[in-house]
């Protein structure tokens, strides 16, 4: 029996159940074990709780043997690798884009100036301000239902959340607009899951690897390499999205490339620095480092640590 650790929220258990069911479909007995995390117990802003707020307790449960593996929202994992654990599988990714849920079915351009938009993500808030729509940003915590209710009860005019979470909970009908990357780059690894186990457990890692998706792993590797190089931690105003795309060479042959777009935004929205690059899936990390280097050349370091930004600021 493979014991799979998960946070207790509906979204987390739904995500972990997808992994459990996939393992069972492959002929492996599996069950979920709920683990309480600091991020679930606290209502404080995420950036004040430190890196690993949703993942530390799950990793402790792996280490002390309460569970054999854990399912994380990949974007919540610290960028620094922990030698005690290995990410044995990254399943196929859900849509990584951000989504707007607004009152009366409105899209962003229809919201009046001064409308209240909920998000506690510095990345979303910074890119929102950069759009220049005159919208007021308000803090947003709690599970997905709690967040959605703040729109339906009139407390907020709109909220911005990951489309992937809404999809996994069957709530896509609530989406009034899906934000394209040209409007808002998502958090690195948004929409992807990470299945982690003990580094020395090669037998389990082999079983879990049956669920790995090579294209998703390449994309997430590039995005997270960019984030790690920017030394931003998971709450800094950094966006990134990578995807495997088909190209055609001079002789008409189709081949695959890995495309990466990244940005760093001033928290007040006064500036957004963007860069992009093309590489291969086999050198995904190098692509992430190259795009990060371009962002640095364009002034990302000064923008991130300048006035109005701080080192602990998804």
From Swiss-Prot:
Known catalytic reactions: 4 porphobilinogen + H2O = hydroxymethylbilane + 4 NH4(+)
Name of the protein described by the UniProt record: Porphobilinogen deaminase
GO molecular function term, any single one: hydroxymethylbilane synthase activity
GO BP term, example: protoporphyrinogen IX biosynthetic process
This protein's GO CC annotations: cytoplasm
Modified residues (S-(dipyrrolylmethanemethyl)cysteine): 234
Subunit (UniProt): Monomer.
Remarks, miscellaneous: The porphobilinogen subunits are added to the dipyrromethane group.
Role according to the record: Tetrapolymerization of the monopyrrole PBG into the hydroxymethylbilane pre-uroporphyrinogen in several discrete steps.
Family note: Belongs to the HMBS family.
Cofactor: how and how many bound: Binds 1 dipyrromethane group covalently.
Organism the protein comes from: Mycobacterium ulcerans (strain Agy99)
Metabolic or biological pathway, per its Swiss-Prot or TrEMBL entry: Porphyrin-containing compound metabolism; protoporphyrin-IX biosynthesis; coproporphyrinogen-III from 5-aminolevulinate: step 2/4
Cysteine disulfide links: none
Keyword annotations: Porphyrin biosynthesis, Transferase
Cofactor(s), names only, from the UniProt record: dipyrromethane
Main EC class the enzyme belongs to: transferase
InterPro entries: HemC (IPR000860), Porphobilin_deaminase_cofac_BS (IPR022419), Porphobilin_deaminase_N (IPR022417), Porphobilinogen_deaminase_C (IPR022418), Porphobilinogen_deaminase_C_sf (IPR036803)
């Amino acid at each position: 029996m493979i014991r799979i650790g998960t946070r207790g929220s509906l979204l987390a258990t739904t995500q972990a159940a997808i992994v459990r069911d996939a393992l069972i479909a492959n002929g492996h007995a599996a069950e979920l074990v709920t683990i309480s995390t600091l991020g679930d117990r606290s209502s404080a802003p995420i950036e004040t709780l430190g890196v690993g707020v949703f993942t530390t307790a799950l990793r402790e449960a792996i280490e002390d043997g309460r569970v054999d593996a854990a399912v994380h929202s990949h974007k919540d994992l610290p960028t620094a690798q922990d030698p005690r654990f290995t990410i044995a599988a990254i399943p196929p990714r859900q849509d990584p884009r951000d989504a707007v849920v607004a009152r009366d079915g409105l899209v962003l351009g229809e919201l009046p100036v001064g409308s209240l938009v909920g998000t506690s993500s510095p990345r979303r808030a910074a890119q929102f301000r950069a759009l220049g729509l005159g919208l007021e940003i308000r803090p947003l915590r709690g599970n997905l239902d709690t967040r959605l209710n703040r729109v339906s009860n009139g407390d907020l005019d709109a909220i911005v959340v990951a489309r992937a979470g809404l999809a996994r909970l069957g709530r896509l009908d609530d989406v009034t607009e899906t934000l394209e990357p040209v409007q808002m780059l998502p958090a690195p690894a948004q929409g992807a899951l990470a299945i982690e186990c003990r580094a020395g457990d090669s037998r389990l890692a082999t079983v879990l690897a049956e669920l790995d998706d090579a294209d998703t792993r390449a994309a997430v590797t590039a995005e997270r390499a960019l984030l790690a190089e920017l030394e931003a931690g998971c709450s800094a105003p950094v966006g990134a999205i990578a995807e495997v795309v088909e190209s055609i060479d001079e002789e008409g042959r189709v081949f695959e490339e890995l495309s990466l777009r990244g940005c760093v935004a001033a928290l007040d929205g006064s500036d957004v620095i963007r860069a992009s690059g093309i590489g291969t899936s086999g050198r995904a990390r190098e692509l992430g480092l190259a795009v990060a280097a371009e962002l640095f050349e364009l002034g990302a370091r000064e923008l991130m640590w300048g006035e109005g930004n701080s080192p602990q600021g998804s």
